[in-house]
Structures are given as structure tokens and as C-alpha cells.
Amino acid sequence: MSAEPVATGIDIHTTAGKLADLERRLDEAKHAGSERAVARQHAKGKMTARERVLSFLDDGSFVEFDELARHRSSSFGLERERPYGDGVVTGHGTVDGRPVAVFAQDFTVFGGSLGEVFGEKIVKVMDHALKTGCPVVGINDSGGARIQEGVVSLGLYAEIFKRNVHASGVIPQISLIMGPCAGGAVYSPALTDFVLMVSEKSHMFITGPDVIKTVTGEEVTFEELGGAHTHNSRSGVAHYEASDEEDCLEFARALLSYLPSNNLDEPPVFETEPVLSVTDADRELDTLIPDSANQPYDMHTVIGHVLDDEEFLEVHARFAPNIVVGFGRVEGRPVGIVANQPMSFAGTLDIAASEKAARFVRTCDAFNIPVLTFVDVPGFLPGTDQEWNGIIRRGAKLLYAYAEATVPLVTVITRKAYGGAYDVMGSKHLGADVNLAWPTAQIAVMGAQGAVNILYRRELMASGDPDAERARLVTEYEDTLANPYLAAERGYVDAVIRPSDTRVQIVRALRALRNKRATLPPKKHGNIPL
């Protein structure tokens, strides 16, 4: 295959000519997409791949890899079009001064399709990230495999997947979906730690609407099938729905601020002034829990009161809203938050909530981030739909995640902690280090109404006034069992505290656990109930 012809007017036999030729080639690499293709990209409200990379990284920090790489294929006339870069921008730079590897697929060149050289460039930057111990951020905007290059495209996809797996739990991996991502291409983002999508711009699916209509007869739009809203609210594939591309890039930067560069590093710390006295803001929690156990409250209020500056970066916000997960800081140090949300399905655990929380706990554990758990859970959601879809196996994932975690685990029971859900939500029995309860906590096998109906069924049937008798027995049950004190007597909770003391108690607990060392039995790997 012949080299690129020398531009007219450049004498490459002189040093000046060689430098001029280099500048020409580099300029072509930076403008690989045609003006028409770039204009179409901008008309859709989308940046080009290079614009995205430069917007994401610190100014002047980008170091590009393989800028002059070109494909080697001669099939179907490809030899007549060999743009520099081959449709993907790769390299490394910094975000807030910390090293980050990045690749961005360029839809203006071959529709961002993945061929041999394209794939090799991504593999190289992933290898660099793993070797140097820095996060890798992938910006996806691609038409899929480059059909003209045949099976070699599929081979490079698998090479990328393998590296996603090998890097899992070693370096943070974040995928930004900023356009189409279809077919086999979706599996690389699915293997990463966080997937971010852009509203009305991003689409992910294995098979598109046309194929689905042909095979099943279903009619569905791109947005309904695999849009950002669908994957954030229904499938749970995505962790954030951005309003536009800049919002997506900013959320990725925010995520990185909570994550260490790799599993051997500690998360970044921001120095703050320690406050170990109870403040007026802390005292607001003393009146948060309603007198009625059936009245909801917003768990975000509790979360905000214990975090620095009430800053909480929630992930997976629209999926399984009955459980809340996200990142914050306590004394400038990152923590992961897992909390039941009484405002949604009364905070019950279902399949989606269990898997959402399990994944988050395991992510925190992989990257040395302590987990704070706030518990108000009446149990697992009942119903044939849950049972037939595998709540036993899939709910066990959350139990597994807590039991295998070796990072500091601090649990606060604010109200209900019933049945198996009490065990699953970061209980002392699964290995939590510090377990606290508010005086409003109700720790029991089940709620008072259900317990009374089972324990006193005959007495209620024989009573002349079953409603009054049931009310009396419910009160007796609540006074006797539905409280935190039996658990405290047995050491299942380490202390019953005023709600206003929560922040200070968490600060003290995390300080004490800062040098925690825990080991698990040697094994190749566990067999999580997938």
C-alpha cells in the first residue's frame, strides 16, 4: 500500500520541507472529518470527538496517541479513503490535575465505525490506563462494526471487552454515550463502572427498531427502545441522563472527583475544618420522622445533613427510586451512600433496588470508598411478578455485596428494619463495623399489623370487638418488640442515638475505621448469584 502522496509545493528532501509535511499531516489528522460531516454533527447539537476530549480534559493537558494511524484495508474501495486517526481520538490528559486516559469515537469519519486500526488504538489506550493505574473514559458515538473490514472488527471488539473485564475493579471505567451505540458495541459500556447518556441524543440497543419489527412485529422508536430516558428509568443500564453533552462531561468529571485513580490508591481528599459539635442544622433531624409509621419522609434530607456542604452526587437516580445511591464527602473524604427511600414504594426492596444497590456497594468496595447505609425498609416487595422474576436469587446479590465488602461500613437505622431486609441492609451480622439506630427505629421480624394477625388469629376471631383488640395488641407488640432496644441489648446495634447526633457519630466512626484492615478467605473468586 503506497504512502500518502506529498503535497504540491513541499520539498521533503529538506528539513524545512519535512517539518512542513509533518504540519500538513497533523492538520489533516485534526480535521479528518469532512466539513459537511462536521456541520451535520454540529447541527444535531453534538460536538466532534476532538471537541469532546478537549472540553473534558484540563486545558492544554491532552497528549494524543496514534494521531497518524490509518487503516490498512483494501476491500470495497477503502484504499481510496484513508483518513488519519481512522475515526477515533485516543490519548491521555488530566482532570482536576489527575491523570485520565480517554478515547472518543468520531462519527464524522466512517460514521465512527470500528475497524482494525480503530480498535487497536482503543486497546492501546486501555493498556496504557491499566499499566499506569489511571481511569479510562470512553466517549461512544459510533455506527458499529466497520462492515468492509469483516471479522477483524469483531475480533477487536472482543479484545476491548477482555480489557474491560481485566480492568474491572482495578481502574475506574466510565462510558459516555453521546450518539448511537448498537449491536456488539454496547457490551463495552455495559462492562464499565458507570454509563452516562445524553437526553434525545444517545441510543443503545442490541437490535434496532427495524430488525425488531421484522422478527417480532413490534413497532418501537429509537428513543423508546434505547434512548437515555429508557435506560435510566427502565433498564438500569445507564447511571445518569444528561441534558446535553456539556452536562454529561461535567458529571463524568464530578464522578472522577470521588474515585481513586486505581484500586491501590485512596480516593482524593479535600481538607475541611472539623466540626464535632451538634449544630442547629443537625437538630432539624430530631423532628424529621413522622409519628405515624405509615407516613413517608424524604431520605435525601437525612443524607444531606450528614454530608459536607450537603453535596450529594446521586447516580442511578431514575432507576429503582425506592433505594438511593450516590457519593458525598464526610470531613472531605469520599463516601458511598446507600439508603432506602420511604417516598417510593415505602422503601421496600425489590429486584431492581437490590441489584442497583448491590452494584453500587461492590463499586465502592473495589475502590476503597466507605459505605454509609441508611435503613428504613419494611421488607422485600411481595408479589408473583417479583417471585417469578427471581427476587430470591437477585435479592441475594445485595446480601452478597455487603458480606464481601472490606471497606468501612457504617449503618444507621432511622425507622423500619423488618425481616430479611434488616439483615440485607448492612446489618452487623453481615460484617458492618458500626451500627447505629435512632430511637424511632423498629427492628423486628415483621411489622406490628402482620405479626398480630399471625400470632393472635384465634383470639381476634373469638373477640367481640376484633378491631379494638387488634389495636391493643398492635400497641403491645410495638412497645415490646418494634424498637431498637432489644437489638441494642444484644449488640446488634452499637448505640441508640439522637438523630441530631448522627453526623458527629458518623464522623467519629469513619475516623476510627480509617485504617481498617479486613481479609476474606483465599479464593479464585466468589460465585455471586448472577
Question: Which sequence ranges carry the predicted segments?
Answer:
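Ligand-binding clefts of soluble mixed alpha/beta catalytic domains
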Residues: 1-530
